[in-house]
From Swiss-Prot:
InterPro entries: Plug_dom, Plug_dom_sf, TonB-dep_rcpt-like, TonB-dep_rcpt_b-brl, TonB_rcpt_b-brl_sf. GO terms for biological process: siderophore transmembrane transport. This is Probable TonB-dependent receptor HI_1217. Keywords: Cell outer membrane, Membrane, Receptor, Signal, TonB box, Transmembrane, Transmembrane beta strand, Transport. SUPFAM superfamilies: Porins. A motif (TonB C-terminal box) lies at residues 896-913. It comes from Haemophilus influenzae (strain ATCC 51907 / DSM 11121 / KW20 / Rd). Residues 1-27 form the signal peptide.
Amino acid sequence: MKKAIKLNLITLGLINTIGMTITQAQAEETLGQIDVVEKVISNDKKPFTEAKAKSTRENVFKETQTIDQVIRSIPGAFTQQDKGSGVVSVNIRGENGLGRVNTMVDGVTQTFYSTALDSGQSGGSSQFGAAIDPNFIAGVDVNKSNFSGASGINALAGSANFRTLGVNDVITDDKPFGIILKGMTGSNATKSNFMTMAAGRKWLDNGGYVGVVYGYSQREVSQDYRIGGGERLASLGQDILAKEKEAYFRNAGYILNPEGQWTPDLSKKHWSCNKPDYQKNGDCSYYRIGSAAKTRREILQELLTNGKKPKDIEKLQKGNDGIEETDKSFERNKDQYSVAPIEPGSLQSRSRSHLLKFEYGDDHQNLGAQLRTLDNKIGSRKIENRNYQVNYNFNNNSYLDLNLMAAHNIGKTIYPKGGFFAGWQVADKLITKNVANIVDINNSHTFLLPKEIDLKTTLGFNYFTNEYSKNRFPEELSLFYNDASHDQGLYSHSKRGRYSGTKSLLPQRSVILQPSGKQKFKTVYFDTALSKGIYHLNYSVNFTHYAFNGEYVGYENTAGQQINEPILHKSGHKKAFNHSATLSAELSDYFMPFFTYSRTHRMPNIQEMFFSQVSNAGVNTALKPEQSDTYQLGFNTYKKGLFTQDDVLGVKLVGYRSFIKNYIHNVYGVWWRDGMPTWAESNGFKYTIAHQNYKPIVKKSGVELEINYDMGRFFANVSYAYQRTNQPTNYADASPRPNNASQEDILKQGYGLSRVSMLPKDYGRLELGTRWFDQKLTLGLAARYYGKSKRATIEEEYINGSRFKKNTLRRENYYAVKKTEDIKKQPIILDLHVSYEPIKDLIIKAEVQNLLDKRYVDPLDAGNDAASQRYYSSLNNSIECAQDSSACGGSDKTVLYNFARGRTYILSLNYKF
């Protein structure tokens, strides 16, 4: 295999030299000059002419919709919504994260790993994504499964590239300078959103230009919004709390009287036996003994004999087991009943962003340099991102089209002292850091072969390093850590709550928050494009060498010496060979079919190999790379002048099937590989959460449709996606509440490590609009549809042929993930917008989002699977008890209250001058 790979790479390199000779030989056979009239196609229409599963969205910075909604309007693309992450996390065909989706900004892979602190009842969650301000995004291109160039490096399902605004986006026509102003505000907790960008450009004598652009953006995002129907998200579940409180008071011997006051429940014997007229021949002797019984007799004397109201009886209100004390007791324990999905105050976001670019361009070369910053404060946590990038292109002839790119990205998350993660308090300031460096160089050649065959080749090399580190090892965020500052009193030592243990019994170090380590990718890639008339063949191939070095905790227990838990490192390397081939034909404007086959790989991440709930229990560097084989069949339609002279129709229909081997997911089960350590055996620590390769092949199939029609006066956009999959879940997709869990549940805490990523069964968007008064006035209506989707439950599903047996003397080995349940299809959501352009490039836009004020749930929102959607109920009725005796006296319940925004009015202004 190694010899074959080496031979392929050498052969691909020689094609460049051979092609030059062929081209020179054909030069003298040129018969005459051929005049070619190129079609001028706008960026948003180009995907309808390209033989690939690609979609584009332009002018994102002008949008009043969120960046999540923009991405979700693309068929086959979605986002993992997380109100606390501060990043844009793109999902392609149910795959998400570093290596599954190559998310880029201006062609630079984004590696930031965001981990949020706890929000209300929910534990923090983690996800990869791009830390970018949507106000700076000119457009986004999404490629699904097929690839070319550097975008195919470590990209299992595809890539998404966010393009930022440049000099020529800001300056109109040949003017020397330009300014863009954007402002947005609205109702329903829509906070301020402002951006300004200024650019200057000077034309040079050689026909080139030099320019500079600077932009500033500030945004605030509040989650304290009202859902459909007008109720605030944070207040959801008050009805459940009220019922549980009533049940709590009933158990304590109180009921509500007609005036809404708590009063003694005279049907309870401890009250009825102390009435002034109690029946002395009844079974009351036990209930009339002691000081508490005496107090009850005094209370009932005032209530029944003297006719006082309950609120005026001091002993009833302030007694040891009176109403005030019962109320305080409920308040201390009400967390177990709360189902509010988030605590809005902990997710208030305030961001400030800067963009500075320098550009030079002429007929033969282009040079660009940029600095981009983002500072985002989410609750008490801060995110800081700094991105530096240089691009250079030199194009002298058909043999020399050289591109060079270098980038340096730094991302930091600052956790304050006193913050909570998984219910555990951060003891001191904690800073996690991500540093990525990328260098990419490639050269393209264009040849004219015999038989009027055009050949274009690109040969490139990419070097990419990515490192995760922390300013200190957070020992307090460990499963068995024993420290007075984390002691929860009796709660710690009972069967409920946090584990703790001495060093002589249990390891004190875990790696659950931001595992540290370094990745290196070295990739050689080669693209070829053959064209003859209406037929085209594209083939892209790359070879990647991947090396890693990660940090984990050791455990040394030597007789006669103190137990040592050193920080150790483990390294390794893996290889992958990826290729993508597309055959297409331009049979007519109405029918341009294409067929694509691609084989792609994804390397295991540091977070998967070195996450460990305790000591080195979860470390698994033997993970195999994921491998996907995808077949796509589709066609394009691009027709100008269909019904009128200038109308344009674009259609793209794609069907696909994917087969993924060695799918990586986290599993709860047996963890040791070289024999069970003594500390684990003596404490019964047989199971933990670790990452594994899924044994069955993951299969996906689906259809994606995109239609665009524009005739000036009328326009329509349609997108629709359908998918079937047997994609497995993770064990960490849903976890018990970190601050209200039993010790058994704490062992199964997933720390927000993963979330369900399967796409809804189907989803789509339809937009219809019309333009009037020389296209100055635009009216539009958009309808969003989400079909049946999934969320993880707290219940276990056993895999690899294993099963769990209760009450056995010796537990068998088993492996578990989380079951899912369906989220029913959501109501159709309508958004109405009106925009007016009184003068050129001044656009005033008014929008009503969720026009009909529907109550709906956004699929793939982290809050859907949050622990706060599960609570303990004591309200089981007699039917439940009759069916299952274990349900008597209370049981776990689940709800889905993580609703999206209700009706919201938006007003925005965009001015370019």
